[in-house]
């Protein structure tokens, strides 16, 4: 019996919608990253993007445990000398709640072109509305 290898043109990708309301950030992000990679499928192949599209709603209501709401710090750099910026979890949720989930999931995906292709299949929205109704996403309970 020959080893099966998925081909990019034969991969079937589904659309799923996930409600992040009350979900713990890290536990949600690991499941999302696994599904974006396609590890839940029998035809998973490490060097082929076999994952599904995922829409995350209610990003502003994601939960963290302990004191992370005030103690967790996100760093970024402007590119200029002395241009390091920082924001706490609370500030990030207030400014752009989508970025919190995006950053958590992106760090769990492979680095390089394949990881960027997987990351592009993640759609995160702060509220309950999304503009992907035409794709008929199925509800995914995580």
Curated annotation (Swiss-Prot):
The entry's keywords: Ribonucleoprotein, Ribosomal protein
Pfam (any one): Ribosomal_L13
Domain of life per record: Bacteria
Gene Ontology cellular-component terms listed: cytosolic large ribosomal subunit
Record-linked InterPro entries: Ribosomal_uL13, Ribosomal_uL13_bac-type, Ribosomal_uL13_CS, Ribosomal_uL13_sf
GO molecular function terms attached to this record: mRNA binding; structural constituent of ribosome
GO biological process: negative regulation of translation; translation
Keyword DNA-binding: no
Reported function: This protein is one of the early assembly proteins of the 50S ribosomal subunit, although it is not seen to bind rRNA by itself. It is important during the early stages of 50S assembly.
Family the entry assigns: Belongs to the universal ribosomal protein uL13 family.
The protein's name in its UniProt record: Large ribosomal subunit protein uL13
Native source species: Yersinia enterocolitica serotype O:8 / biotype 1B (strain NCTC 13174 / 8081)
Species lineage: Bacteria, Pseudomonadati, Pseudomonadota, Gammaproteobacteria, Enterobacterales
